[in-house]
Amino acid sequence: MKGPSIVVKGARAHNLKGVDIELPKNKLIVMTGLSGSGKSSLAFDTIYAEGQRRYVESLSAYARQFLGQMDKPDVDTIEGLSPAISIDQKTTSKNPRSTVATVTEIYDYIRLLYARVGKPYCPYHGIEIESQTVQQMVDRILELEERTKIQLLAPVISHRKGSHEKLIEDIGKKGYVRLRVDDEIVDVNEVPQLDKNKNHTIEVVVDRLVVKDGIETRLADSIETALELAEGNLTVDVINGEELKFSENHACPICGFSIGELEPRMFSFNSPFGACPTCDGLGQKLKVDLDLVIPDKNKTLNEGAIEPWEPTSSDFYPTLLKRVCEVYKINMDKPYKKLTDRQKNILMNGSGEKEIEFTFTQRNGGTRKRKMVFEGVVPNIDRRYHESPSEYTREMMSKYMTELPCETCHGKRLSKEALSVYVGDYNIGEVVEYSIKNALYYFENLKLSDQDKSIADQILKEIISRLSFLNNVGLEYLTLDRSSGTLSGGEAQRIRLATQIGSRLTGVLYVLDEPSIGLHQRDNDRLINTLKEMRDLGNTLIVVEHDDDTMRAADYLVDVGPGAGNHGGEVVSSGTPNKVMKDKKSLTGQYLSGKKRIEVPEYRREITDRKIQIKGAKSNNLKNVNVDFPLSVLTVVTGVSGSGKSSLVNEILYKALAQKINKSKVKPGNFDEIKGIDQLDKIIDIDQSPIGRTPRSNPATYTGVFDDIRDVFAQTNEAKIRGYQKGRFSFNVKGGRCEACKGDGIIKIEMHFLPDVYVPCEVCDGKRYNRETLEVTYKGKNIADVLEMTVEEATHFFENIPKIKRKLQTLVDVGLGYITLGQQGTTLSGGEAQRVKLASELHKRSTGRSIYILDEPTTGLHVDDISRLLKVLNRIVENGDTVVIIEHNLDVIKTADHIIDLGPEGGEGGGTIIATGTPEEIAQNKGSYTGQYLKPVLERDSVE
C-alpha cells in the first residue's frame, strides 16, 4: 500500500480468526458486515484498545496509577498506530445536571460572555443596575437640554412601612427644608401623619438647579451630599421630563436590589453561587401528582381510590382515613369524583389544627391508640419521601410524584441574580432555551457596543464555531438546555463528534460506532462532510457503519464476515467501495451493487376501520396533532431528526396505552383524547435498554428457555439418583451454584474512586456452578457447557426437544444465532438487547390484539440482518397483531403498509403531520423529505 498505513497482524479478539489487514492512514475507513461478524472486535477491541494502551504506557508511572492497567488486545502486532479516540454510543451522561450546552462546553463560553459584557437589571423595576461615579452622574445631567429645571433628591426611605417620625425629625435638624413624601413635595415641618401599615417613600430635596454652563461644581457637591444621605443613591426629578436614577452601589436606586461583581461561576447551575436555591440548579422539583395518587376517580375510598394508602403491610393509614371520614362526614362509599371540593381538600391537604383520635392494629397483632393532626395525603407523601431514612419508602413514595418545573426559577436552574443579567435583550436562561439553529443566528447577529465587541470578540468566535459544528452534524433542532440523558445514542455520538472537530486535533485515530443512527437521509450528507472534514485535518477515521451513503463515501471499505459469531471473524473483502462491489464473496458488495436487495412487497395490507385514534397531541413540539394508527398492519413513523416521532409514539401512544392496559404509573405526554384502546389487550415496547442491570441476566434467562433447559437436566438419570430438582441448576439460588461468586462466575473488586473491576471466580473458574452440579451431564454436556454454547449450536443440541428448539429458533430468526446463551446481558449492544426482547415475545401465543412498538430496530444491523428482521415483523402482523416502528432506514420504510410522516423540520419547525398513506403515496408528496428519498428507492427495488 502506498503512503503511511496501519498494519494489523494476527488479531484474535473475540471471534476474529487471526486477521491480517493493512489500512491506509489519514483516510475515511468504513468497516461493515453482519451483526456479530467481528467489526467492533477489530475496530474497537483491537485497533482502538491498542492505540489507547500505548498512549497510557507512554505516560509517567504516577499518571498511570490513576488510569489503571490496560490489557493488551489479543493481537500479534499493530504498526503505524496514532493516539486513539473512541466515539461510541455508550458514554452519554445520565446526570440531570448535564445538558447539550455543558457537554459541548458551549455553556462555559456563554457564562464567560455574560460575566464580561452582561448588563444587570433590577428584576422588580427593570432599571439597569450600574455603579456610577459622581463625575459620570454630573456628565449625564449636563446632557439635559439647557434651562431644564431639576431637583436633586436623596431617597432615604424606599417602599418601607412605618410612620418614620424620628427620621423626618432628624432630617429637619440637619437643616433640610423640603421632602418629597410619596411623590408629594412637603415642608419638613408639615409632613402629614404617615400610616405605619403602608409602604412609603421619603426623599430629601438636596438642591434645585437649572441646567446651564458653570453649575458643575455646585452640582457635584450636591450630588455627593445626596449620595451620603441616601447611602449611595440619587434621584433627579426633571421638571416636565423623565426622572433619572443613579447609584454608586451596583444596586437598584429604587429598591436596593444589588448584584455583586459579575463572574462566570455566578451563571453556573452547578455552583452554589449561581444555582437556584429552591431546586439546587436542577430546574425541576418532585411534586406529588394527584393523578397518580388517585388513578381511578370513579373508585370509592372503600374501594381503595387513594392508592398509596391501600391496606398492605399495616392498617395505620386506612384506619386513620376511616376516622377522618367519620369526623368530617365523608361518605366512603361515594365515588371520589363525586365528593365536594371541601371534602377533597381535607383528604388531600389536611384538617388544619384539629387533632384526631383513633386506634389501629399493629403488625404484631396488638392495638395502639394515637392522637394526631391529620396532615393530608399530599403532605404525607411529600414528608415521607423527603424525611424517611428507608430507601424502600422513598422509592414507594416516588411512584406518586412527578417532576415539575421549579416554581422559583421556572425551570431555568439559576438564581434570581443570574437571571437579572442581560446580553442584548435576553438573559442566559432564555438563550439556552434556543435550539442550536436559533442560538447560532442569535450569536451571529448580536449587536454590541464597540467596547463590548472588543471584549466579547474571541468568546463569540468560540461559541459560533461550536454551534456551527453541531448544526453541521444534523443537530440543529436540539435545544441547548436539553438534558443529555434524554439524547439518543446517535445524537450523543454526533455531539461528541462536533466537540472533537472543535478541538481541531490532527494526527489522531478516531474510531466511531454508527454515527448515522437516528439521522434522516436528508442530513446524511452533512454528517459525511463532517467526517471528511475531520479526515482532511490529517486524521484517520475508522467508522463501523451499515449506512449505504457512508459506505459509498469511504476512501477504504472493509467487509468483515462472512457470517456472524463463529461463522465470521474474517476480512471477506477490502479496498475502495467499487472494488468491494465487484467482489462476489462480499455480501455487502452484492447489496451495494444492487445484485441483492430487499424487495418492495407485491401488495400492501388493507387499512380497515380498526384503529387507535389520538386527538390533540401536544407533547414537546407536537402542534395539536390528530393521527390514526391502523391496527393489524405494519406502520412506520418517519420524519427528519427532531420532528416529533418519539414524542408521538413513545411519549403519547405507548404511555397512554400502557396506562390503560398495563395500569402503568408513567404519565403520558400532553394530548386531548385517545380512542380504540378496547381493541387491544397487550402492549409491548421493544426498546434498546439492557435486558438486565447485572451480569446475571442473559439471553437464556430473559427468553425463559433456561427454565426448560433446567427441566431437561433435572430429568437426567444422574440428577434423579442424586435427588437434584430443577432448582439445583439455577445460579440464582443456593444449592447448585458456586457460593464463592454467588453464581455470577465473576468476582467484583471495588476500586473506590476507579471503576469496579470484574475478575473470573477462581473457585469455579467462571462456570457459576459447584463441582457436584457440573457432574450431571446431558448428551455429554453439563449445564455450564450449555450456557457457553451459541444459540445456533444449542438449537442443534436440543433439536429433539420442541419446546426448547422453538424458543431458540426465534433468536436465530432475529439474527442472534451467534450470541451465547449465557452471555452477560450488560455486554449486549442496544440492537442485540432489542432483538432478544423481540425473540422472547415471538414464541408466545398470539392473540391478534397486541401492539408492538419499536424505536429504530435497525440500529447495528447490516442490510441482510434487516431482511431477516422484516420477515419476523411481518410474521407478527400476519398473526393479526400490530407493529409500529420509528425508523429512518429506507429498506424498512419501503416495506410498510402505512406511513405517518412528521415534519417538515426538526424542533420548533416540526411537530405536524406532513403526509400519511402507503409508501407510494408518500413518495408522490412533494412536501415530504421522506417521500423525496423514498421515490427512487421504490422505483429501483420494486418487483419486476
Curated annotation (Swiss-Prot):
Residues 309-587, 607-935 form the ABC transporter domain. It is found in: Cytoplasm. One of its GO terms (cellular component) is excinuclease repair complex. GO terms for biological process: nucleotide-excision repair; SOS response. Keywords: ATP-binding, Cytoplasm, DNA damage, DNA excision, DNA repair, DNA-binding, Excision nuclease, Metal-binding, Nucleotide-binding, Repeat, SOS response, Zinc, Zinc-finger. SUPFAM superfamilies: P-loop containing nucleoside triphosphate hydrolases. Pfam families: UvrA_DNA-bind, UvrA_inter. Disulfide bonds: none annotated. Its main location: cytoplasm. InterPro entries: ABC_transporter-like_ATP-bd, ABC_transporter-like_CS, ATP_grasp_subdomain_1, P-loop_NTPase, UvrA, UvrA_DNA-bd, UvrA_inter. ATP binds at residues 33-40, 639-646. A zinc finger (C4-type) spans 252-279, 738-764. It comes from the Bacteria. The UvrABC repair system catalyzes the recognition and processing of DNA lesions. UvrA is an ATPase and a DNA-binding protein. A damage recognition complex composed of 2 UvrA and 2 UvrB subunits scans DNA for abnormalities. When the presence of a lesion has been verified by UvrB, the UvrA molecules dissociate. Belongs to the ABC transporter superfamily. UvrA family. This is UvrABC system protein A. It comes from Staphylococcus epidermidis (strain ATCC 12228 / FDA PCI 1200).
